[in-house]
Amino acid sequence: MPRLHDHVWSCSGSGAARPHSLPRGMIAAARCPQGSGAPEPAPRSPRAGTAGCGARPGSWHHDLVQRSLVLFSFGVVLALVLNLLQIQRNVTLFPDEVIATIFSSAWWVPPCCGTAAAVVGLLYPCIDSHLGEPHKFKREWASVMRCIAVFVGINHASAKLDFANNVQLSLTLAALSLGLWWTFDRSRSGLGLGITIAFLATLITQFLVYNGVYQYTSPDFLYIRSWLPCIFFSGGVTVGNIGRQLAMGVPEKPHSD
């Protein structure tokens, strides 16, 4: 009997030892799925990354074409309206065969203005990204529309207002142009690009007038009007705001989806 009793206790001891050995087996079994499952996400992440990288260039080019078309169309329409306004006020004079056309303007003026608007509108957000200074001041379409209205008003004032001399008119339009920049832009890149655009556009206009393509009435500054750089400056700021707003809508689409 003692031997049987000892044998029973030995069996119970071995049975009691099994529960102590089970957690180790369970821990080992629990570690196996982690080890086998760990490499699984590794091949998935490169595939997702390559798919995203492959989709980005196509979407970026598609967005670039869309923004270019919108800016080009805006430049064409604005050129037709503002140029017609200046012709009616006898500020800009074209040859007689040009005035006989349906739009009372040279055929090359709207395409050139549209191309310039597309270049300027794409350049503004590009310069902002390179400088690392994203423009976030008044980023809504209502502000952009007000900026367009102010720019049209400045151009209308240049053709309609009568001052004692051109210096007073130029100073007034310069103050209005700087006020437009301060109200709707307030960025150093916008100020620098606006001044650069005004300088280059004035040189191109002087070249065209000097070669007899068209002319201005009462020129007072190297064959042109002295207030013309102010118009180019405010136009550059306006088109730049449109380009920034169009570029700002691009990253918002994935978040909305």
From Swiss-Prot:
Annotated protein name in UniProt: Insulin-induced gene 1 protein
Membrane-crossing ranges are 65-87, 107-124, 140-162, 166-184, 190-211, 226-243
Q: How does it sit in the membrane?
A: Multi-pass membrane protein
Entry keyword set:
Cholesterol metabolism, Endoplasmic reticulum, Isopeptide bond, Lipid metabolism, Lipid-binding, Membrane, Phosphoprotein, Steroid metabolism, Sterol metabolism, Transmembrane, Transmembrane helix, Ubl conjugation
Residue positions, PTM Phosphoserine = 187
Where is this gene product found? Answer: Endoplasmic reticulum membrane
Assembly information from the UniProt record: Interacts with SCAP; interaction is direct and only takes place in the presence of sterols; it prevents interaction between SCAP and the coat protein complex II (COPII). Associates with the SCAP-SREBP complex (composed of SCAP and SREBF1/SREBP1 or SREBF2/SREBP2); association is mediated via its interaction with SCAP and only takes place in the presence of sterols. Interaction with SCAP is mutually exclusive with PAQR3.
Q: What does this protein do?
A: Oxysterol-binding protein that mediates feedback control of cholesterol synthesis by controlling both endoplasmic reticulum to Golgi transport of SCAP and degradation of HMGCR. Acts as a negative regulator of cholesterol biosynthesis by mediating the retention of the SCAP-SREBP complex in the endoplasmic reticulum, thereby blocking the processing of sterol regulatory element-binding proteins (SREBPs) SREBF1/SREBP1 and SREBF2/SREBP2. Binds oxysterol, including 25-hydroxycholesterol, regulating interaction with SCAP and retention of the SCAP-SREBP complex in the endoplasmic reticulum.
- Cross-link Glycyl lysine isopeptide (Lys-Gly) (interchain with G-Cter in ubiquitin) lies at 136, 138
List cellular component terms (GO). SREBP-SCAP-Insig complex
Q: Which GO terms describe its biological process?
A: cellular response to insulin stimulus; cholesterol biosynthetic process; SREBP signaling pathway; SREBP-SCAP complex retention in endoplasmic reticulum
> Per the record's keyword annotation, is Transmembrane helix included, yes or no?
yes
Give the free-text PTM comment from the record.
Answer: Phosphorylation at Ser-187 by PCK1 reduces binding to oxysterol, disrupting the interaction between INSIG1 and SCAP, thereby promoting nuclear translocation of SREBP proteins (SREBF1/SREBP1 or SREBF2/SREBP2) and subsequent transcription of downstream lipogenesis-related genes.
Comment text on domains: The KxHxx motif mediates association with the coatomer complex.
Extracellular side of membrane? 88-106, 163-165, 212-225
Q: What family does the Swiss-Prot or TrEMBL record give for this protein?
A: Belongs to the INSIG family.
Short motif KxHxx, span: 251-257
Cytoplasmic face residues: 1-64, 125-139, 185-189, 244-257
**GO MF term list:** oxysterol binding
Region entry Disordered: which residue ranges? Answer: 32-54
Query: What are the site positions for Required for the recognition of 25-hydroxycholesterol?
Result: 151
